[in-house]
Curated annotation (Swiss-Prot):
<comment type="function">
    <text>Receptor for secretory phospholipase A2 (sPLA2). Also able to bind to snake PA2-like toxins. Although its precise function remains unclear, binding of sPLA2 to its receptor participates in both positive and negative regulation of sPLA2 functions as well as clearance of sPLA2. Binding of sPLA2-IB/PLA2G1B induces various effects depending on the cell type, such as activation of the mitogen-activated protein kinase (MAPK) cascade to induce cell proliferation, the production of lipid mediators, selective release of arachidonic acid in bone marrow-derived mast cells.</text>
</comment>
<feature type="disulfide bond">
    <location>
        <begin position="1065"/>
        <end position="1085"/>
    </location>
</feature>
<feature type="domain" description="C-type lectin 1">
    <location>
        <begin position="227"/>
        <end position="356"/>
    </location>
</feature>
<feature type="disulfide bond">
    <location>
        <begin position="176"/>
        <end position="202"/>
    </location>
</feature>
<protein>
    <recommendedName>
        <fullName>Secretory phospholipase A2 receptor</fullName>
    </recommendedName>
</protein>
<dbReference type="GO" id="GO:0005886">
    <property type="term" value="C:plasma membrane"/>
</dbReference>
<keyword id="KW-0677">Repeat</keyword>
<feature type="transmembrane region" description="Helical">
    <location>
        <begin position="1394"/>
        <end position="1416"/>
    </location>
</feature>
<dbReference type="InterPro" id="IPR018378">
    <property type="entry name" value="C-type_lectin_CS"/>
</dbReference>
<feature type="disulfide bond">
    <location>
        <begin position="328"/>
        <end position="344"/>
    </location>
</feature>
<feature type="topological domain" description="Cytoplasmic">
    <location>
        <begin position="1417"/>
        <end position="1458"/>
    </location>
</feature>
<feature type="topological domain" description="Extracellular">
    <location>
        <begin position="24"/>
        <end position="1393"/>
    </location>
</feature>
<feature type="disulfide bond">
    <location>
        <begin position="1207"/>
        <end position="1221"/>
    </location>
</feature>
<feature type="short sequence motif" description="Endocytosis signal">
    <location>
        <begin position="1432"/>
        <end position="1438"/>
    </location>
</feature>
<dbReference type="InterPro" id="IPR001304">
    <property type="entry name" value="C-type_lectin-like"/>
</dbReference>
<feature type="disulfide bond">
    <location>
        <begin position="838"/>
        <end position="935"/>
    </location>
</feature>
<dbReference type="GO" id="GO:0030246">
    <property type="term" value="F:carbohydrate binding"/>
</dbReference>
Length: 1458
């Protein structure tokens, strides 16, 4: 019986639901569950609901819902059943088996699902289906639609899981893992169980008892009102702050975390608030995120909580260049000018802020939009109880101020978006582009104030603003006309200016609107509070003449204020006139007379517009004013009505498309108002991030491409298709993004084009850190991280001439098509003339080598030949009647001859070939005849720089290794007496006719690393610290691999001012316990004890090597105690798995840098991508190895390469990419799995007032690394917690300590070590000898140091340093894990429920399970390989003996024959 239970647990077998019928739930209870994201899945066609049974899932009547029908989307795209306490799983080895519930961390079934347009989709494109009328299965054959029972929208996707970020604990702020197992129970939400203080907490891995990673959760009961125990209150301002200094999140993650706690990222409104924050974090050497950001591409810097930005304390190093990627703000309390900008993807601690008397920022003060009829003097414009006058004489700011004062007015102050709208209209009517406004600063730090003394309650900064001019005592502000945005301007410049003064307010009766209607501009508005369907509301009867249409952000803000006055329900909605009238997915305005009008502005909520065929309503709250698609027939809402102030006949105006042709080589088609240009990697210097690409387009006066309607998307798709090989996965940035934190998570176009269709599938809902979209040539958009680098497409209005940037090198209008460029000459000439012209342009007359190329050429010459013409191609007879050959020497592998034409062989003249623009067929003609022709080139004109010239292969001496065009010697002598310092290594290489190696690519780095397998001795390479940007051979450093990545020149911290600096030289690490494998770091050049790598140029003088005779890669390879098998066949990922199994292997898993490097070299030689065993079922959020291996090692191409599909391949540089599993690749890599060792350290950590992380048999607290304490104070703190200061006893422990504090980023510099340095030796204060030390570049000489020195560890360099014992720095506590401790809960508060009998029973059970597991393990080792987990990802390093690679796979036949 015990054996059966254990096997079921290990297999992750289907969970059995509780015996007996589950209690029925009332409709009210079901609706309550829905508020928590828990729903019932109903078949749309069969009207029955999915219920978890004892062994299978079935369809049952929905009339008596019970807990076994309740589902919830949880972490990793899992679907969790509340009653069955298990996750929906698909057995991939037998997909036809009915679906069941499994342990939620099972590795033997697929647990990941996606909801997409009423379908639930798993791996292999299997969707949830119904079999035999009520059995739930997964199949790829049919499509079954599912809806949410008793839900207004019926959308099963609306409750998709959103990460819940933790605070405190020991997880550095990482999100909760739901469900997580604690005390033998799966929790799908935060719990108070085990907490004496009743706080909500969660685990951040699936099993708390195994990993002990946890943190506190936001408390929903206190998020809305007040400041509970997790906030610190400023009694003077009644503002609360939350200091998350142990967390390490990206900006967007920190933004989400603050919102979940009912607050927002920190905004700083004045110097007093900044001083308060500085005082609170004064003891922490930490840089933190604030809410400052520049993520709205159409605006400037802003606070994420909407607070006006009028106080500034920028660091002098801040850059306002458009190409700089730092768009998120930080605060550093240790600096007087404390504000900096950072890359938003960096991970940092953060501070949240919450107002006690908080009012929703989007509920605008209604009075700002209320219409007041106002009377003014002649020449002054009335608006909202004030009078305004644009003075059309240019003056400096101070002159303008005094001029207004002289007319009893002031320079205009602007307090709302309503007033911005008025100013834009005023400037537009007067044809003025810019004006002074009354905002200025005369202080430092900068604090902008209105000249009339009114408070700054609103700001509207322009892109890259406010820019601060150094050494300026006064800063002044102007406003531009197009959007009313502000910018900081030199006060001595001259501009028009606007004066403002109070007017005479008239009665409400003079507004021009009927009673009950509100006026804005030339229209009157009213809310019909009766709930109606869209068809009734839009009929014109209840809302004459029509529902509201919204033209711009100003009208939207007015509508929002109007709604706020009547909203008293949580879920109130208001119909507007927007509808997908033709069910095409494109939304248009439905106006009076049932006519359609195009959309000029949109204001969608997150994940909207979700579907086609719907009608649009405005949300009344949370967030107010946002648009959502609703069912036109069944959904009921109030109505927003709109009518003109004066009845006037609407002018029917014909919309005229501009007919101006596109300038230069921009492209369009008839009927489109814009021109497009594709910037792909063949034509530009580099791929770029989204913001860099947008700035690149702006240099031309353009923006990243948008799609105003389906015709534009179709054109862009047609533009891409012929350019690139269809097997290529090309991705291009377009303007679609949701970067702006004030935009409620909705997507928008960077050029302001309205979003009139649903461009993203429901697949991507909930993934809120991929904020920018790329376009793929299969008409799909894919969200990616904005910091990843891609190609891009720009768009510009057809009648706007593109600007020519100074760096742009214009090329003739060559057309790119699949790795070649073509220049079409429609003017006729003889064949030899074109041979000369094409040659002069470094090209050849056209060659055609495929049907695709033929199709491309024919399409172009048809368009260029109005009446039909023949065009020369590059086939020519060498002599009369000779065989035709391509002039560029390439073989004739494709032909398309006209077989009807007579081919006489009696011609006296030399003939050349042509192609007909009518038929596309080829024929011959005398070369002297005049025809148009086409040039073709393979070497591209790069608009930013030209390419390098090719090199030649040669031979290498015996014992040296071939790599690319180099010979490499990897020398790690077995005898330590032959190890060398850097100078000796350099001289040795010189004597051999070479130099120390210059590593110039990732593949070369991998080649060297793979040849160091089994070594623990690092090797010298050709760099020195006095010129680390140039290799010893004189080449610039184009590739680098420093450890850590942002540190190049590490100083010697144990060197005093009296000692001369040590010259430093670069080593490549093959000892992962001190530096990560393959990484570079600096060491004392004179220190002996290292190997080295030499390089020299291959000898091409004797005879050139034909690389085609290099040894082919064998199908079976041995490396590093592993056996690999290479499968060469065109196959999908699934076929690759089966093929590996047929060869007695598994699709490869890669767990360390050595084996990754080996495979990188192999893939580089093979020349094409291969499948590996990594896959995902949740759009790239989490990945698993198909052989069950657990490893944290990754090698992605970039941060977004994991989001492109469900299955993974390695490219020819070894980097990993995900793609569609059904894609065909030319091969796969298999391996014969090795046995893994069982988990060896089951002990638990005791509970104290600080959190602990376990490694092997010790526990560590990293919560104190940001504290500042002397050595003695730190020692006493740890002692009170029943622990000691940190000691480092072996290499594995040192490796663990290198990795774990990386989560704190640059915030952690040094921590104390529990040791003393006496008589040139280190002694641990716990009495154990210090066998392990790491002084780095130089061991300290005590003669040069003051007394009372203590030992510290520098993070992240990992070296030891002497520091005065009284110095304040961070520290880490360490204690032994205790198997006798029974953990009742994480965090604060010791457990007092330890019962000796329970301890004894626990030991007996553990021993029984270990004995039984060992027995089963012996019976089936292959099965247990799949069960190996990663409870602790740090294992003792195996001391491999040096592996002698008898024949390196890159040695050529020539060397073998020497």
């Amino acid at each position: 019986m015990l054996l059966s239970l254990l096997l079921l647990l290990l297999l992750g077998a289907p969970r059995r639901c509780t015996e007996g019928a589950a209690a029925a739930l009332s409709p009210e209870r079901v609706l309550k569950w829905q508020e928590k994201g828990i729903f019932i899945i109903q078949s749309e066609s069969l009207k029955s609901c999915i219920q978890a049974g004892k062994s299978v899932l079935t369809l049952e009547s929905c009339k008596q819902p019970n807990k076994n029908m309740l589902w919830k989307w949880v972490s990793n795209q899992h679907l969790f059943n509340i009653g069955g306490s298990g996750c929906l799983g698909l057995n991939l080895s037998n997909p036809e088996q009915p679906l069941g519930l499994y342990e939620c961390d099972s590795t033997h079934v697929s647990l990941r699902w996606r909801c997409n347009r009423k379908m639930i989709t798993g791996p292999l494109q299997h969707t949830v289906q119904v079999k035999q009328d009520n059995i739930i299965v997964a199949s790829g054959k049919r499509l079954h639609k599912w809806i949410s029972y008793m839900s207004d929208s019926g959308d099963i996707c609306q409750h998709v899981h959103k990460d819940l970020y933790t605070r405190k604990g020991n997880a550095h702020g990482t999100p909760c893992m739901f469900p997580f197992q604690y005390n033998h129970q799966w929790h799908h939400e935060c719990t108070r169980e085990g907490r004496q203080d009743d706080s909500l907490w969660c685990a951040t891995t699936s099993r708390y008892e195994r990993d002990e990673k946890w943190g506190f959760c936001p408390d929903p009961t206190s998020a809305e009102v007040g400041c509970d125990a997790v906030w610190e209150k400023d009694l003077n301002s009644h503002i609360c702050y939350q200091f998350n200094l142990l967390s390490s999140l990206s900006w967007s993650e920190a933004h989400s975390s603050c919102q979940m706690h009912g607050g927002a990222l920190l905004s700083i409104v004045d110097e007093a608030e900044e001083n308060f924050i500085r005082k609170q974090v004064s003891g922490e050497a930490v840089e933190v995120w604030t809410g400052l950001n520049q993520l709205d591409v159409n605006a400037g810097w802003q606070w994420s909580d909407g607070t006006p930005l009028s106080y500034l304390n920028w660091s002098p190093e801040i850059s306002f260049e458009p190409f700089v990627e730092y768009h998120c703000g930080t605060f550093n309390s240790f600096m007087p000018r404390a504000w900096r900008s950072r890359n938003c993807e960096s991970t940092l601690p953060y501070i949240c802020k919450k107002y006690l008397n908080h009012v929703d920022d989007e509920i605008v003060e209604k009075d700002a939009w209320k219409y007041y009829a106002t009377d003014c003097e002649p020449g002054w414009a009335p608006y909202h109880r004030n009078c305004y006058k644009l003075q059309k004489e240019e003056k400096t700011w101070n002159e303008a101020l005094h001029s207004c004062l002289s007319s009893n007015s002031t320079l205009i102050d602007i307090g709302s978006l309503a007033e911005v709208e008025f100013l834009v209209t005023l400037l537009g009517n007067e044809n003025a582009s810019e004006t002074w406004i009354g905002l200025s600063s005369n202080t430092f730090p900068v604090s902008f104030e209105w000249s009339n003394g009114s408070s700054v309650i609103f700001t509207n900064w322009h892109t890259l603003e406010p820019q601060i001019f150094p050494n300026r005592s006064q800063l002044c502000v102007s406003a531009e006309q197009s959007e009313g945005h502000w910018k900081v301007t030199d006060c001595e410049e001259t501009h028009f200016y606007v004066c403002k003064k109070p007017g005479h307010v008239l009665s409400d009766a003079e507004s021009g609107c009927q009673e009950g209607w509100e006026r804005h501009g030339g229209f009157c508005y009213k809310i019909d509070t009766v709930l109606r369907s869209f068809d009734h509301a839009s009929s014109g009867y209840y809302c004459p003449p029509a529902l509201v249409t919204i033209a711009d952000r100003f009208e939207q803000a007015f509508i929002t204020s109007l709604i706020s006055s009547v909203v008293n329900m949580k879920d109130s909605y208001f119909w507007i006139a927007l509808q997908d009238q033709n069910d095409t997915g494109e939304y248009t305005w439905k106006t009076a007379g049932q006519k359609s009008e195009p959309v000029q502005y949109t204001h969608w909520n997150a994940h909207q517009p979700r579907s086609s065929g719907g009608c649009v309503a405005i949300r009344g709250r949370n967030p107010i004013g946002r648009w959502e698609v609703k069912d036109c027939v069944h959904f009921k809402a109030m109505s927003l009505c709109k009518q003109p102030v004066e009845t006037r006949e609407k002018m029917e105006h014909e919309e005229r498309w501009p007919f101006h042709p596109c300038y230069l080589d921009w492209e369009s088609q008839p009927g489109l108002a814009s021109c497009f240009k594709v910037f792909h990697s063949e034509k530009v210097l580099m791929k770029r991030t989204w913001r860099e690409a947008e700035a690149f387009c702006e240099e031309f006066g353009a923006h990243l491409a948008s799609f105003a309607h389906i015709e534009e998307e179709n054109f862009v798709n047609e533009l891409l298709h012929p350019k690139f090989n269809r097997s290529e996965e090309r991705q291009f940035w377009i303007g679609f993004n949701k970067r702006n934190p004030l935009n409620a998570g909705s997507w928008e176009w960077s050029d302001g084009t309205p979003v009139i269709s649903s461009f993203l599938d429901n697949n991507y809902f909930g993934e809120d850190t991929r904020n920018c979209a790329v376009y793929k040539a299969n008409k799909t958009l894919l969200p990616l991280h904005c910091g990843s680098k891609r190609e891009w497409i720009c768009k510009i209005p057809r009648d706007v001439r593109p600007k020519i940037p100074s760096w742009y090198q214009y090329d003739a209008p060559w057309l790119f098509h699949q790795d070649a460029e073509y220049l079409f000459y429609p003017h006729s000439s003889e064949w030899s003339s074109f041979e000369f012209v094409c040659g002069w342009l470094r090209s050849d007359i056209l060659t055609i080598h495929s049907a695709h190329e033929q199709e491309f050429i024919l399409s172009k010459i048809k368009a260029l030949s109005k009446y039909g013409a023949n065009w020369w191609i590059g086939l020519q007879e060498e002599t009369a009647n000779d065989e035709l050959r391509w002039r560029d020497g390439t073989p004739v592998i494709y032909q398309n001859w006209d077989k009807e034409r007579d081919r006489s062989m009696n011609n006296q003249s030399q003939r050349c070939a042509f192609i007909s623009s009518i038929t596309g067929l080829w024929d011959r003609e005398e070369c002297s005849v005049s025809m148009p022709s086409i040039c073709k080139r393979k070497t591209f004109w790069v608009i930013e720089k030209e390419k390098d010239t090719p090199k030649q292969h040669g031979t290498c001496p015996k014992g040296w290794l071939y790599f690319d065009y180099k010979c490499l010697l990897v020398n790690v002598p077995k005898d330590p007496s032959n190890w060398k310092n850097w100078t000796q290594a350099r001289d040795f290489c010189f004597d051999e006719g070479g130099t120390l190696v210059a590593i110039e690519s990732e593949v070369e780095q991998a080649f060297i690393t793979m040849n160091l397998f089994g070594q623990t001795t690092n090797v010298w390479i050709g760099l020195q610290n006095d010129d680390y940007e140039k290799w010893l051979n004189g080449n610039p450093v184009a590739y680098s691999n420093w450890s850590p990545s942002d540190i190049i020149n590490i100083p010697s911290y144990n060197t005093t001012a009296d000692q001369k600096p040590i010259p430093l030289c670069a080593l490549l690490s093959s000892n992962p316990n001190f530096h990560f494998t393959g990484k570079w770091y600096f060491e004392d050049c004179g220190k002996e004890g290292y190997g080295f790598v030499c390089e020299k140029i291959q000898d091409s003088a004797g005879h050139e090597v034909n690389t085609s005779i290099m040894d082919p890669i064998p199908n079976t390879l041995e490396y590093g105690n592993r056996t690999y098998k290479i499968i060469n066949a065109n196959m999908t990922w699934y076929a690759a798995i089966k093929s590996c199994q047929l060869h007695g292997a598994e699709l490869v898993s890669i767990t360390d840098q050595y084996h990754q490097s080996f495979l990188t070299v192999i893939l580089s030689r093979l020349g094409h991508a291969h499948w590996i065993g990594l896959f995902t079922a949740d759009n790239g959020l989490h990945f698993d190895w198909s052989d069950g291996t657990k490893s944290s090692f990754t090698f992605w191409k970039d941060e977004d390469s994991s989001f492109l599909g469900d299955c993974v391949f390695a490219d020819t540089s070894g980097r990993w990419h995900s793609t569609a599993c059904e894609s065909f690749l030319q091969g796969a890599i298999c391996h014969v799995p090795t046995e893994t060792r069982p988990f060896e350290h089951p002990e638990l950590c005791s509970e104290t007032s600080i959190p602990w992380i376990k490694f092997k048999s010790n526990c560590y607290s990293f919560s104190t690394v940001l504290h500042s304490a002397s050595f003695e104070a730190a020692h006493e703190f740890c002692k009170k917690e029943g622990s000691n200061l940190l000691t480092i006893k072996d290499e594995a422990e040192n490796s663990f300590l290198l990795e774990e504090p990386f989560a704190f980023g640059a915030s952690v510099q040094m921590v104390w070590l529990n040791a003393q340095f006496d008589n040139e030796t280190v002694k641990w204060l716990d009495g154990t000898p210090a066998d392990q030390s790491n002084w780095g570049i130089r061991k300290p000489d005590m003669a040069h140091f003051e007394p009372h020195q203590c030992l510290a560890l520098r993070i992240p360099e990992g070296v030891w340093q002497l520091s005065p014992c009284q110095k304040n720095m961070g520290f880490i506590c360490k204690m032994k894990a205790d198997i006798h401790t029974v953990k009742e809960h994480p965090g604060k508060g010791p457990s007092h429920s330890i019962v000796p009998l329970a301890v004894a029973l626990t030991l007996v059970v553990i021993l029984a399970i270990i004995t039984l597991s060992f027995y089963i393990y012996k019976q089936n080792k292959g099965f247990f390989r799949r069960l190996a987990g990663v409870g602790n990802s740090y294992y003792p390093t195996t001391n491999f003996s040096t592996i002698h690679l008898e024949e390196n796979i890159l040695i050529s036949d020539l060397e073998k024959n020497d």
